[in-house]
Amino acid sequence: MQKYSEMSKEQLQALKKELDQQYAEIKAQGLALDMSRGKPSVDQLNISMDMMDVLSSSTDLRCETGVDCRNYGVMDGIPEAKRLLGEISEVDPEHIIIYGNSSLNVMFDTVSRSMTHGVMGNTPWCKLDKVKFLCPVPGYDRHFKITEFFGIEMINVPMSPEGPDMDMVEKLVSEDPAIKGIWCVPKYSTPQGYTYSEETVKRFARLKPAAPDFRIYWDNAYSVHHLYDDEKEQDFLLEILDECAKAGNPDMVYKFTSTSKISFPGSGIAALAASKANLDDIRKYITVQTIGHDKLNQLRHVKFFKNLDGVHAHMSRHAAILRPKFEMVEATLEKELGGLGIGEWTTPKGGYFISFESMEGCAKKIVAMAKEAGVVMTGAGATYPYGKDPKDSNIRIAPSFPPIDELEKAAKVFVVCVKLASVEKLLAE
């Protein structure tokens, strides 16, 4: 295929006329399709329905230490839930605190606590002149919303298939004590689906921060969320807590996880893994905040999954639903846009997103055109702090939620919008 940039003005005008016609025909269909969030589909939710039958009025609702899970108590999680989430997080159960239904909630609480009370005896952030966070971009919009909410200055750090630009991370963290943290989705990152290389993880562990209360916010949201069952087709991520301990920085990381996209989003269990010193510090606040989280839900999850093998078997069923959707979107992008020079996209082996890079200055227009044609997508710019993509080029594609027939229609609408926006940009130059 001829690249759009190599076409003459006359060729581009003829192509625009053709694309305008296609776009008008799409709009006339009155579509109402949604690719805006990385939500599990109804089919995915259905595979967890047996969990609803695990507990009944005749079930022994005591955990393995004999505590009645119907009552108050066990502030940081029942032992069997710690063991299960520890396996998912690749850490020992003693390094885990079990929370409620949302790891995002745990991250918000962690930042909030740091603002009001500081980290392990250090000055509360609210008493400092300036607090900054590093934000690998493109990244997860809800991370950025947390730091924006607290008035924390966010600094963009470019991503590559190896992870964040570690030269930049090392330099900034070592020179500026106002930098208190970095947001990371280290495995099947949002939205690109990249997994940090072993060297990147080791460089994180060896950081020498100017701030004694600097923390890596390691959001391990997609630790077991592979698209393929063959281990050769799965990404591997080095375990960060272990690496930090080896490097003499045991307290430098908070590792977050949840079962939100394993069982039921919003009704799963979340966990924080960290060093003993960090967990001791955190427990001081949790004992004031709660008498305990939902132990019946913890028990329900343990009885349903039993162990990590049970989780992997369950995730294989998720993958069987997700894989054809990702492959269909990727095939459509390749067939319709390959070789045209108007877009690039990732082909992840796991996670929930495909990252699309349009021609510079086209993302907002593409998303707006798709919406007008009946396809709702994640807002352009959402993958950057403050919603400001400096190149206006990144679009997050979320294939998971729509049925595959609707997704196919949405993908076809998307490529027409990409072509039309690109032609209009070239004609305007």
Give the positions of each predicted feature.
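N-terminal "arm"/small-domain region of PLP-dependent enzymes with the aminotransferase-like
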Residues: Q2-D76, A81, G86-E87, E372-V375
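Conserved core of the PLP fold type I
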Residues: V67-P212, S223-G248, A363, V413, ...
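Conserved core segment of the aminotransferase class I/II
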Residues: Y99, L241-R323, E336, V423
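Walker B catalytic acidic pair
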Residues: N220
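Conserved glycine-rich beta-strand-loop-beta hairpin in the small C-terminal domain of fold type I
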Residues: S316-E330, I342-E357
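Conserved PLP-binding active-site segment of the aspartate aminotransferase-like
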Residues: S355-E360, M377-C417
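Short amphipathic alpha-helices in soluble, non-transmembrane regions
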Residues: I366-E372, A410-V415
